[in-house]
Amino acid sequence: MRELVAKRYAKALVEALGEDRLASTLEWLKGSESAFGTEAFQEMLASPQISKTLKGQVVLDVLGDGEAKLLNFIKVLADKNRLELIPDVCKELEKSIAATRNEYVAVLTTQEAFDDKTLKAIEETLAKKLQAKLVLSQKREEFEGVKLVVEDLGVEVSFSRERFINDLKNHILKAF
């Protein structure tokens, strides 16, 4: 749910500021990351005893000087009691910047670690197929198979040993 709301705010920022100023906006918003990482700051944002205006002012103090549209953005978030969405808005802005640059993250899930040469070959082949720049990261799990996901493009490719065996059994049973 938070992601959907953050996506709307990020989209509004992109429309208000334009694609060319996204990087500087993201940098400005990321100035609050350390504060959002503290429990005391989170408690202050969640506290019903502190006014929305004061919460907004505290966040603005953490962020420092910014242009009028960004200051108004923070005031709107404070007014709607959604200041805790700032880290999520940052993630959505990062995705938007990556999409304009045609850069995406792919996650390869396997049981065993692949060597760098194999990972690079997979990355290059997939990048060529998708006509995009990819950064491939590997994730190890207890999973008998291979799964490759590029979430932002909606691409998922998997091969599971268990599914292969089940499909083979069904095929043999249908043959008789």
Curated annotation (Swiss-Prot):
Keyword list, A-Z: ATP synthesis, Cell inner membrane, Cell membrane, CF(1), Hydrogen ion transport, Ion transport, Membrane, Transport
**Could you tell me which species this protein originates from?**
Wolinella succinogenes (strain ATCC 29543 / DSM 1740 / CCUG 13145 / JCM 31913 / LMG 7466 / NCTC 11488 / FDC 602W)
Family stated for the protein in its record = Belongs to the ATPase delta chain family.
User: NCBIfam families, alphabetically?
Assistant: ATP_synt_delta, PRK08474.1
* InterPro entries in alphabetical order: ATP_synth_OSCP/delta_N_sf, ATPase_OSCP/dsu
Per UniProt, subcellular location reads as: Cell inner membrane
Q: Name one GO molecular function term.
A: proton-transporting ATP synthase activity, rotational mechanism
Q: Which Gene3D superfamilies match?
A: N-terminal domain of the delta subunit of the F1F0-ATP synthase (1.10.520.20)
Q: How does it assemble?
A: F-type ATPases have 2 components, F(1) - the catalytic core - and F(0) - the membrane proton channel. F(1) has five subunits: alpha(3), beta(3), gamma(1), delta(1), epsilon(1). F(0) has three main subunits: a(1), b(2) and c(10-14). The alpha and beta chains form an alternating ring which encloses part of the gamma chain. F(1) is attached to F(0) by a central stalk formed by the gamma and epsilon chains, while a peripheral stalk is formed by the delta and b chains.
Entry keyword annotation includes Transport: yes
**Function, please?**
F(1)F(0) ATP synthase produces ATP from ADP in the presence of a proton or sodium gradient. F-type ATPases consist of two structural domains, F(1) containing the extramembraneous catalytic core and F(0) containing the membrane proton channel, linked together by a central stalk and a peripheral stalk. During catalysis, ATP synthesis in the catalytic domain of F(1) is coupled via a rotary mechanism of the central stalk subunits to proton translocation. This protein is part of the stalk that links CF(0) to CF(1). It either transmits conformational changes from CF(0) to CF(1) or is implicated in proton conduction.
One GO cellular component this record assigns the protein to is: plasma membrane
Q: How does it sit in the membrane?
A: Peripheral membrane protein
| Protein name in the entry | ATP synthase subunit delta
Keyword Transferase, does the record have it? no
Where does it mainly reside? membrane
